[in-house]
Every structure is written in structure tokens, then in C-alpha cells.
Amino acid sequence: VARSWVCRKTYVTPRRPFEKSRLDQELKLIGEYGLRNKREVWRVKFTLAKIRKAARELLTLDEKDPRRLFEGNALLRRLVRIGVLDEGKMKLDYILGLKIEDFLERRLQTQVFKLGLAXSIHHXRVLIRQ
């Protein structure tokens, strides 16, 4: 029986597997946000890369281009809705300034810990699983 799986890759592995500066940075993120593995870091990094790529492409278009106006507003509204971008910063230029930490701050695990409902960032993950 032939099955076709409709799925796409949600992360991209690093080009250089043993780059010390990157490994240290990822380990710091994992510790700070209580992530389970490197794949969770790569997933957020990939999402950010896709959003920034779309913003860069839209910025190359003319200011009055209908595609830039329509898709740009949609992208900005989406980022404001998920809480990554402030409503005062609704410009494509601000999307390029986003960091991986902006996305990791919006995770439920981080929010539970920041609100003081959990004793540690790892405890927050346990509470969510219950």
C-alpha cells in the first residue's frame, strides 16, 4: 500500500556540526529556556529564518507594490498576534531585528515559569505534561 505523507521538515541541521561558538550558544538557550534537545532550538531558528527571508523579499519590492502591502501587512499582523512583535513596531524593518529569544519567550513553558507558577523552567515543562 503506497502512502503519501503530507509533511515538511520543520528544522534544518547546522552546516558545521562541531562549531564551538554555535554549540555553546545552543547549550545556553537550552538551559535558559528548558528545551529538551537541540532540535527544538533548530526548529525555532528555522521558523525565524523563514519569516526573515519573507521580510527581506518583501523589502526588495517597491513601497507601493500591492504584493508588498498585502503580504507585508499579513506577516506583521501574524507576528503581532503571536506576541513576537509589538504593535508600535509594525514595519518590515523590525522583523529583521527579531532574535530567537523573542520566539522562545512566547513558549508556554517559559510563560508558566515567568508567571511564577513553576519552581523552575524544567518544572514548568512537567506541569504542562500533567
From Swiss-Prot:
**Subcellular location, record wording:** Cytoplasm; Nucleus, Nucleolus
Please provide the record's keywords in A-Z order.
Acetylation, Cytoplasm, Isopeptide bond, Nucleus, Ribonucleoprotein, Ribosomal protein, RNA-binding, rRNA-binding, Ubl conjugation
A GO molecular function term, named singly, is:
structural constituent of ribosome
Read off the InterPro entries from this record: Ribosomal_uS4 (IPR022801), Ribosomal_uS4_euk/arc (IPR005710), Ribosomal_uS4_N (IPR001912)
Q: Does the keyword Cell cycle apply?
A: no
Q: What is its main location?
A: cytoplasm
Q: What's in the GO CC field?
A: cytosolic small ribosomal subunit; nucleolus; ribonucleoprotein complex; small-subunit processome
Residue ranges occupied by any S4 RNA-binding domain in the UniProt entry: 106-130
List residues modified as N6-acetyllysine: 64, 114
Record bears the keyword Acetylation = yes
Can you tell me which family this protein belongs to? Belongs to the universal ribosomal protein uS4 family.
UniProt subunit comment: Component of the small ribosomal subunit. Identified in a IGF2BP1-dependent mRNP granule complex containing untranslated mRNAs. Part of the small subunit (SSU) processome, composed of more than 70 proteins and the RNA chaperone small nucleolar RNA (snoRNA) U3.
Which NCBIfam families does this one have? uS4_arch
Instruction: Give the function comment from the record.
Output: Component of the small ribosomal subunit. The ribosome is a large ribonucleoprotein complex responsible for the synthesis of proteins in the cell. Part of the small subunit (SSU) processome, first precursor of the small eukaryotic ribosomal subunit. During the assembly of the SSU processome in the nucleolus, many ribosome biogenesis factors, an RNA chaperone and ribosomal proteins associate with the nascent pre-rRNA and work in concert to generate RNA folding, modifications, rearrangements and cleavage as well as targeted degradation of pre-ribosomal RNA by the RNA exosome.
Q: What is this protein called?
A: Small ribosomal subunit protein uS4
UniProt organism field: Sus scrofa
Gene responsible for this protein:
RPS9
